[in-house]
Structures are given as structure tokens and as C-alpha cells.
From Swiss-Prot:
Any single GO CC term annotated in Swiss-Prot or TrEMBL for this entry: extracellular region
Tissue specificity remark: Expressed by the venom gland.
Compartments where located: Secreted
Keywords linked to the UniProt accession: Disulfide bond, Ion channel impairing toxin, Neurotoxin, Secreted, Signal, Toxin
One Gene Ontology MF term: ion channel regulator activity
Predominant cellular place of this UniProt entry's protein: secreted
Bridged cysteine pairs (disulfide): C31-C51, C37-C56, C39-C58
Protein name: Putative neurotoxin-D
Signal peptide: 1-19
């Protein structure tokens, strides 16, 4: 039981870390809001994005 809970916690933490990746092509520098980010990954424009501590991150998907 403990092992299962530990494995689930590790998987949850890894998925949370991998959910965001820095967008190196973001045109907004020093973004303040979600709308300031422009994501251009995988040939798509304007996917869901997030601004964390002034850096633009695109959500996978």
C-alpha cells in the first residue's frame, strides 16, 4: 500500500513538472498575463499559455 502511494506521488510530481515547458519562441518578454504569451509550438499558433514569474510557458496539448 505504501509503495503504491509513493509511486502515485512520484508520477503525479513528474506529470506536474512535464506539464509545462518553456516556450523559446514566445514573442512576449516579461509577460504579465496569460494573453501576453504567444505560443508557436508544433505548427499551431495561440495554444493555451501561462505566464509564470515573467516567463511565458505553453501547455502541452
Amino acid at each position: 500500500m505504501r509503495t503504491t502511494v509513493a509511486i502515485l506521488l512520484v508520477l503525479f510530481a513528474l506529470s506536474a513538472i512535464l506539464a509545462f515547458y518553456p516556450d523559446t519562441t514566445a514573442e512576449a518578454k516579461g509577460c504579465v498575463k496569460k494573453v501576453d504569451c504567444v505560443c508557436k509550438g508544433k505548427g499551431k499558433k495561440n495554444h493555451r499559455s501561462m505566464c509564470i514569474n515573467g516567463k511565458c510557458y505553453c501547455l502541452k496539448g
